[in-house]
Amino acid sequence: MKKLLYAALLLGATLQFTACENDDSSAKPKQRYDLSQGMVISNEGNWGSNNASISLYYTNGDSLANDVYNKVNKDVLGDVLQSITIADTSAYLMVNASNKIIVTSKYSCKKYASITVAGPRYMVANGKTGYVTAWTNNEVAVVDLTTNKVTGSIKVGTGPEGLIVNGGKLYVANSGGYGKDNTVSVIDVKTNAVVKTISVADCPKAFAVDKNGSIWVVCAGYTDWTTPANSTSGALCKINPSTYEVSKIGIAGFNPDKLQINSAKDKLYYGGSYGAPGIYQMDIAATAAPANPFVSGSFYGFAINPSNGEIMAMVADWKVAANNKMVRYSATGSKIKEYVVGVGPNSGYFFN
């Protein structure tokens, strides 16, 4: 009897030890992909291939993780990730060619909602309301960020792209889509009505607000492939938000479509498009565009680290996956390091 009791106790202890061992040491902790811990890179992927992805660069520790969304959700993201916006604790992923916005947790990248929008490009949040440029329908979709439902739409110009909220107004860049447009729609966010249409240069793309409150918009210019003589040059346009007066600085030789501003809001960075010889830096007080790029190279997009001014330049290659890179430059323009990312990186976003 004592032997049986001893054997039973020994077996129980062995099982308990084994269970504890399995719980504590053999189970590897899951990687937590917190989008607020660095810079999130939107990789478009190849059109029609459903291989859009997210890369996460950790600023503390200088490491990079690729394919973050797929790893967390065990699912493909979709076709062409155009941009990413953070609103409160959620990340909104504009999956352009899939006609949807994927909503994930900011802290884990775990998906919890999907919103149908025709050709979503960019989004800006104003309180509990999201405004999304819907390129396909020439409108801005209005999204309730509490329910993640589309509640309305606002008709604007053709091919709406970047947008920004400033002083109770929403500014929308109408790029022209496959045609030609040179306007910025101004919308009152209280009524969601267009209150002004401003003429700028051809093909406005993206905005920035400087330390003086002026609104800058980069315009790529119009390219007429049939009659090149009808093509127009790019420009940086400065809008006075009080009077809506516009002043222009011409950009010759290429068609810029990306615009960023430093944390002091006194220096603009533009470029990041096909044909651009690099990324340019311009003081907001300048009256003419710089002759030479601040960082030379062929970049599809870029981002500025607000904490140290480093430039994160994106190199895209649609044929060779290993050639898609983020190139990190110091605030003075010196190259620091390269990192392999997903296919078609177009920008980076700092959400911390």
Summary of predicted features, one role per range:
Residues 4-6, 21-352:
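Predominantly soluble domains enriched in secretory-pathway, periplasmic, or organellar proteins
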Residues 6-13:
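Sec-dependent N-terminal signal peptides
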Residues 15-19:
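C-terminal motif of bacterial Sec signal peptides marking the signal peptidase cleavage site
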